Amino acid sequence: MALSQVSASLAFSLPNSGALKLATITNPTSTCRVHVPQLAGIRSTFASGSPLLPLKLSMTRRGGNRAASVSIRSEQSTEGSSGLDIWLGRGAMVGFAVAITVEISTGKGLLENFGVASPLPTVALAVTALVGVLAAVFIFQSSSKN
């Protein structure tokens, strides 16, 4: 059984690279490790277990504290609707959440819970086409009313 060594790398720059001594191989018979005396304190964040970002971040703001005003305009309102579309949307969201919960809890797909073990391609295509056509019809009808 062969042992594999996992290593992480870290890119860094040295301000005084001319003072860097040549790297030496510590033990040539075992796995190859390079020892650089000047870099003994610098380790990768993965190997040392430290967070990827430094804990103390100093951020400087340019300019003063300017307040930016943002205006948001919505074209939709619930005042003119009958409320049916709102409740249908809420029902669809709750139904989707229930379906996902049932799939996670049972470990079976939605069709398997209804007794269909393998999906039927023609039925799936027909249902998809029907839903697509009905969605397009409802979208075009609602846009013609406005």
Swiss-Prot record:
The chain crosses the membrane at residues 84-104, 120-140. This is Stress enhanced protein 1, chloroplastic. One of its GO terms (biological process) is cellular response to high light intensity. Keywords: Chloroplast, Membrane, Photosynthesis, Photosystem II, Plastid, Thylakoid, Transit peptide, Transmembrane, Transmembrane helix. May be involved in non-photochemical quenching, a process that maintains the balance between dissipation and utilization of light energy to minimize generation of oxidizing molecules, thereby protecting the plant against photo-oxidative damage. May play a photoprotective role in the thylakoid membrane in response to light stress. Belongs to the ELIP/psbS family. It is found in: Plastid, Chloroplast thylakoid membrane. It is a multi-pass membrane protein. One of its GO terms (cellular component) is chloroplast thylakoid membrane. It comes from Arabidopsis thaliana (Mouse-ear cress).
